[in-house]
Amino acid sequence: MDKINAVITGVGGYVPDYVLTNDEISKMVDTTDEWIMGRIGIKERHILNEEGLGTSYMARKAAKQLMQRTKSRPDDIDLVIVATTTSDYRFPSTASILCERLGLKNAFAFDMQAVCSGFLYAMETGANFIRSGKYKKIIIVGADKMSSVIDYTDRATCPIFGDGAAAFMLEPTTEEVGIMDSVLRTDGKGLPFLHIKAGGSVCPPSYYSLDHHLHYIYQEGRTVFKYAVANMSDSCEAIIARNHLTKEEVDWVIPHQANQRIITAVAQRLEVPSEKVMVNIERYGNTSAGTLPLCIWDFEKKLKKGDNLIFTAFGAGFAWGAVYVKWGYDPKEDA
């Protein structure tokens, strides 16, 4: 019997209509467009500013487009995995809400929380469900409403993040394409350097936590930069070596869109030319679990069947890794 692997058969994406520019950010905090572009590489970010809408709204938009592009019916879907840090509620899962809003009757669903590395983890998890032979169509979504956890009086974090979502369809294949390998790692020593202190069981919501802005992202940028560059580079090197690829055989590197300086440093350490590195941070900012699939959403028409793609990310935890994908289809007319 031929070995079953999981192949990406389509992509869908969504970003909100409202665009928050650097000029607007500079009216909120002491910064400038020149500083943000020079230090972070972001020109604008999309924000979901309609009251009462959360991460599931963006996830539904992305998944709906994905289902249309792959001609998938609601009853075809077996599993939904949503990688997110900004779930609609503490419970139930955003994935369960998404199932209801897509009209999925035969699927089970769960959220995956690995912050900016969440989509990497979802890719490998979804692929293993496909490889089991029991599941035929799996939707994996990376979606975050980062504006809901940003302090817009904090100049260190508020220029960085945006809102967005994108989704992949995973299906079985016996061809030599698909999600080929992964290197995934976690090290809990990263907790002090990147976290949201309040809102969990250690520090439940209180007047104190609200007054002291403890429900927003805290980040020590220099430490995160150092660990991100080293670990993203190392995991890429490991997966390239393990799969006997040369640097020339790598067609695309898809790095988490955290900071342009991180992206550039990783590419330089890997000795990969800039034209092989997917970058869209200038338009979207850091959408956390959304960055990797949003890159594919933007660059899909440039991909060819058989292209070697290396996805890599780093996030709070610390959590990081790389996933090797051999792309499964040529450009589609409706993509």
UniProtKB/Swiss-Prot annotation:
<dbReference type="GO" id="GO:0044550">
    <property type="term" value="P:secondary metabolite biosynthetic process"/>
</dbReference>
<feature type="region of interest" description="ACP-binding">
    <location>
        <begin position="257"/>
        <end position="261"/>
    </location>
</feature>
<keyword id="KW-0808">Transferase</keyword>
<dbReference type="GO" id="GO:0033818">
    <property type="term" value="F:beta-ketoacyl-acyl-carrier-protein synthase III activity"/>
</dbReference>
<keyword id="KW-0276">Fatty acid metabolism</keyword>
<dbReference type="Pfam" id="PF08545">
    <property type="entry name" value="ACP_syn_III"/>
</dbReference>
<comment type="similarity">
    <text>Belongs to the thiolase-like superfamily. FabH family.</text>
</comment>
<keyword id="KW-0443">Lipid metabolism</keyword>
<comment type="function">
    <text>Catalyzes the condensation reaction of fatty acid synthesis by the addition to an acyl acceptor of two carbons from malonyl-ACP. Catalyzes the first condensation reaction which initiates fatty acid synthesis and may therefore play a role in governing the total rate of fatty acid production. Possesses both acetoacetyl-ACP synthase and acetyl transacylase activities. Its substrate specificity determines the biosynthesis of branched-chain and/or straight-chain of fatty acids.</text>
</comment>
<dbReference type="InterPro" id="IPR013751">
    <property type="entry name" value="ACP_syn_III_N"/>
</dbReference>
<dbReference type="GO" id="GO:0006633">
    <property type="term" value="P:fatty acid biosynthetic process"/>
</dbReference>
<feature type="active site">
    <location>
        <position position="286"/>
    </location>
</feature>
<dbReference type="InterPro" id="IPR004655">
    <property type="entry name" value="FabH"/>
</dbReference>
<keyword id="KW-0012">Acyltransferase</keyword>
<feature type="active site">
    <location>
        <position position="116"/>
    </location>
</feature>
<dbReference type="InterPro" id="IPR013747">
    <property type="entry name" value="ACP_syn_III_C"/>
</dbReference>
<dbReference type="InterPro" id="IPR016039">
    <property type="entry name" value="Thiolase-like"/>
</dbReference>
<keyword id="KW-0511">Multifunctional enzyme</keyword>
<dbReference type="GO" id="GO:0004315">
    <property type="term" value="F:3-oxoacyl-[acyl-carrier-protein] synthase activity"/>
</dbReference>
<comment type="subunit">
    <text>Homodimer.</text>
</comment>
<dbReference type="GO" id="GO:0005737">
    <property type="term" value="C:cytoplasm"/>
</dbReference>
<comment type="pathway">
    <text>Lipid metabolism; fatty acid biosynthesis.</text>
</comment>
<keyword id="KW-0275">Fatty acid biosynthesis</keyword>
<keyword id="KW-0963">Cytoplasm</keyword>
<keyword id="KW-0444">Lipid biosynthesis</keyword>
<dbReference type="Pfam" id="PF08541">
    <property type="entry name" value="ACP_syn_III_C"/>
</dbReference>
<feature type="active site">
    <location>
        <position position="256"/>
    </location>
</feature>
<protein>
    <recommendedName>
        <fullName>Beta-ketoacyl-[acyl-carrier-protein] synthase III 1</fullName>
        <ecNumber>2.3.1.180</ecNumber>
    </recommendedName>
</protein>
